[in-house]
Amino acid sequence: MKLTVNRIVKNWDGASKIKYTTTGFVENPMGPGRRFAKQNIDNELWEDAFKQFNLTNIKKDPLYGNILMNHYKDDAFTHIHQDESQEGHVHVRANVMLKKPEEGGDIIIDDNTYQIEVNDLWLVLASMEKHGSTPIKNGERLLFSFGASVPEKEVEKILQ
């Protein structure tokens, strides 16, 4: 899917302001070596993440919320999938790479692989785009995922 905004914000200023907890991890049943933990985040930072992509008419994602995702075993990856959304809305994720393994952990969106570095922020229209990640090696992948439910009309503004 082509966007009118840059999909990736390199070295996002807000990355250093993210406060997260690594307690409460739950194993992800969708694959080995994957886990996640729900997070509470400052509203201003959450809004700023989406403003980077010109998305302002947003509400908190009621399905998944904000989460910390971790791949911690070699060969762990996120399978290619599309998420659900509420009718008339798009499930949107603004993700920040907090820690990256020596190999892998890059994102895949609609069959395109994007190399992401620590502190990069990227946008996924999770209910419209097939997305996942490449398998990791030699280290772990830790990312913070801001979740939003965005009216379809708002998302149309950033589509080509």
Where are these regions (language model features)?
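Non-heme Fe(II)/2-oxoglutarate
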Residues: M1-L63
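Intrinsic-disorder/low-complexity, polar/charged segments enriched in Ser/Thr/Lys/Arg/Asp/Glu/Gln
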Residues: L3, H91-R93, L143
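A short glycine-rich, His/Asp/Glu-containing loop-to-beta-strand
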Residues: N54-T78
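A general structural signal for short secondary-structure junctions and capping/turn motifs
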Residues: I58-D61, S85-E87, Y114-Q115, T134-K137
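A short beta-loop-beta micro-motif enriched in histidine and acidic residues
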Residues: L63-G65, F77-A94
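Short, conserved beta-strand element in jelly-roll/cupin
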Residues: H71-K73, E87-E103, G147
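Short, well-ordered turn and helix-capping elements at secondary-structure junctions
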Residues: K73-A76, Q82-E84, D111, M128
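Catalytic core of Fe(II)/2-oxoglutarate
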Residues: K100-Q160
